[in-house]
């Protein structure tokens, strides 16, 4: 409930952090849907890896044939990448999908975008994510919310290419969903398309995520504790 990370584009941490969910509360969210679920993504509000033990226990229950018997390939953890927890996750025999909320190509830009994660060097986050990919033979998705004037420079493209060209990586360029932070300038769609093209020209695999739920303030970055 709430979030301690403090991304500048996200409402989830606006009113602070209250507590982590228990493993049973996590699993119950799937059960309460009362319909066929073919994909589970741990994201929305909060940092999953800061609730590591309950998260891993919930995933084991979801995967267990006496639990929900959910396929491993259908489970994704979306994380800002706390390095110690990424190292632990690498050693788990889960082989789940991993998305890293990177949002920057330099330490200074990431410190600005995700200020409460400045204790983790961006190079270490990238290194551990790629190590997970190599160990488990999984393509890693790096989420990149485009913020004009902050993370959209040609040097950012070059750095991303230096890290990820030739790796099992996909860059997911995200659109900013409006929040109460009036200081953020949302990019035009043409700017997002142009940045995507620059990344592709640099030899990277890139996609653009279509955001759902914006009309009810339930899209990525808009979910807040009330």
Where are these regions (language model features)?
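Short, solvent-exposed amphipathic alpha-helical segments in soluble enzyme
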Residues: 91-94, 116-117, 159-161, 225
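Glycine-rich S-adenosyl-L-methionine
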Residues: 25-28, 116-131
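Auxiliary Fe-S-binding modules of radical SAM enzymes
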Residues: 130-141, 146-226
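Alpha-helix N-cap and loop-to-helix initiation/capping positions
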Residues: 21, 50, 54, 116-121, ...
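Conserved radical SAM core fold
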Residues: 46-49, 68, 82-86, 95-119, ...
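Hydrophobic/aromatic residues located in beta-strands of well-ordered beta-sheets
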Residues: 40, 75-77, 98, 140, ...
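Conserved Radical SAM active-site core
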Residues: 1-96, 106-108, 131
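Alpha-helical scaffolding segments of alpha/beta enzyme cores, especially the outer helices
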Residues: 28, 32, 54-61, 88, ...
């Amino acid at each position: 409930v709430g979030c301690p990370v403090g991304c500048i584009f996200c409402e989830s941490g606006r009113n602070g952090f209250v507590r982590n969910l228990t493993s049973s509360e996590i699993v119950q969210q799937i059960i309460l849907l009362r319909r066929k679920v073919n994909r589970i993504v741990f994201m929305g509000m909060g940092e999953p890896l800061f609730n590591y033990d309950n998260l891993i226990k919930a995933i084991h229950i979801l995967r267990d044939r006496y639990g929900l018997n959910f396929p491993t390939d259908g489970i994704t953890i979306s994380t800002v990448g706390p390095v110690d927890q990424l190292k632990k996750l690498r050693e788990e025999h889960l082989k789940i999908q991993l998305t890293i909320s990177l949002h920057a190509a330099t330490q200074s830009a990431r410190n600005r975008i995700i200020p409460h994660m400045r204790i983790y060097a961006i190079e270490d986050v990238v290194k551990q994510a790629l190590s997970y990919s190599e160990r488990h033979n999984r393509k890693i998705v790096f989420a990149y919310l485009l913020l004009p004037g902050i993370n959209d420079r040609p040097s950012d493209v070059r750095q991303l290419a230096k890290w990820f060209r030739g790796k099992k990586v996909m860059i997911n360029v995200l659109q900013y969903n409006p929040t109460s932070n009036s200081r953020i300038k949302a990019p035009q769609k043409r700017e997002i398309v142009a940045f995507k093209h620059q990344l592709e020209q640099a030899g990277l695999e890139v996609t653009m995520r279509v955001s759902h739920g914006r009309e009810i303030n339930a899209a990525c970055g808009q979910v807040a504790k009330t």
